[in-house]
Amino acid sequence: MRGVFFVAVAVAIFARSSAEAKLLSEAAPGLAADAVISGESRERFLRVADSEDDDLAAPADDGKTEERAPKFKSLSEINKKLDEEVMVHVSKILGNMGAIHADNIAKARAALEAAHKSGDITDKQLAAGLAKLV
């Protein structure tokens, strides 16, 4: 294993000093072109500049494809909209509270009766527990 390591190090040293190393270190023209963002599309670097790739090409800039202004003009409008959405969510939760409460009481009653049936609690404890559930 050491011999293979030393051979690999020697090949790397010779490759670095040879003229072929310059060719290996240069990027392929296609890769370099993909990495460079043209000056006109710096704001919109996600748009494709290559005309060969029609699937990802951006539509022609006819003035209709410009980015639209946001719907909200201030933070107070955004906060108001978020508050409205939160209140709708809270009202849905509060609307379901009766069903949630009834379900929890039924589960607690079943647990108390199961504990009484198995002898873990007395009749008096069962009555006190059921009275607290009301």
Swiss-Prot record:
| Chain segments annotated as coiled-coil in the UniProt record | none
Q: Which GO terms describe its cellular component?
A: extracellular region; host cell cytoplasm; host cell nucleus
- Mostly located where? secreted
Keyword check for Chloroplast, yes or no: no
Per UniProt, the keywords (alphabetical) are: Host cytoplasm, Host nucleus, Secreted, Signal, Virulence
Which compartments does it reside in? Answer: Secreted; Host cytoplasm; Host nucleus
Q: Where is the composition biased (Basic and acidic residues)?
A: 61-70
**What are the boundaries of the region Disordered?**
50-72
- Residues of the signal sequence? 1-21
Location of the motif RxLR-dEER: 44-68
Q: What's the domain remark here? A: The RxLR-dEER motif acts to carry the protein into the host cell cytoplasm through binding to cell surface phosphatidylinositol-3-phosphate.
Remarks, anything else? Avh238 is highly polymorphic among P.sojae isolates.
Instruction: Give the protein's biological function.
Output: Effector that, due to the lack of a histidine residue at position 79, is not able to induce cell death in tomato, tobacco, eggplant, potato, or in A.thaliana.
The entry sums up its family as follows: Belongs to the RxLR effector family.
Q: What is this protein called?
A: RxLR effector protein Avh238
What species does this protein belong to? Answer: Phytophthora sojae
